[in-house]
Amino acid sequence: MTVDPLIQSLKGKLVVSVQAYMGEPLRTPETMAQMSRACELGGAAIRCQGLADIAAIKGRCEVPVIGLWKDGHEGVYITPTLRHARACVAAGADIVAIDATDRPRPDGKSVEDTFRPLHEEGVLLMADCATIEDIRRAVDMGFDLVSTTLSHGVAAIDCTMADGPDLPLL
């Protein structure tokens, strides 16, 4: 199996999630870009949320940018559809993170139906997973990276970490 050079460049590297939400004091694309630049100077790659942030960060940083689009707060909300993923690519994401759980997606498609066309288009994809089964399925499908982003069970419901991470999975 050949590993994409961009994916290889992340091996052993810290990836910092640079995200702020509506109503938070740092919530501007320019601030996210400045924070990302500081992370880049420290040697980290970036994971960010939202089309404006992806574009602003790509305009300021040279490290790989993992982009995603959070739509809502319940169910599958991390880059939930093909349309969301393609918009992240258009905004400049080097890698697109999508929810790779087997939960129902808002467009009624399976994760495989979302993954396949993107993979065929050459989009590098990160699988955001909740369980070891999600990880195995993502690897079998051919995702470029996997993440345990959704492993803190509550995240699938309301975006909190009240129960903490699933340490055995990690």
List PLM regions with ranges.
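Conserved N-terminal beta1-alpha1 strand-loop-helix module at the mouth
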Residues: 1-90, 138-140
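Conserved beta-strand positions in the central sheet of alpha/beta enzyme cores
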Residues: 15, 45-49, 66, 97, ...
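Active-site-adjacent beta->alpha loops and helix N-cap segments on the catalytic face
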Residues: 26-29, 47-66, 75-83, 100-118, ...
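Short, surface-exposed connector motifs at secondary-structure boundaries
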Residues: 35-42, 96, 117-122
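Glycine-enriched alpha-helix->loop->beta-strand junction motifs that scaffold or abut catalytic
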Residues: 61-65, 91-95, 119-122, 140-147, ...
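Extended substrate/RNA-proximal surfaces in nucleic-acid metabolism proteins
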Residues: 89, 98-99
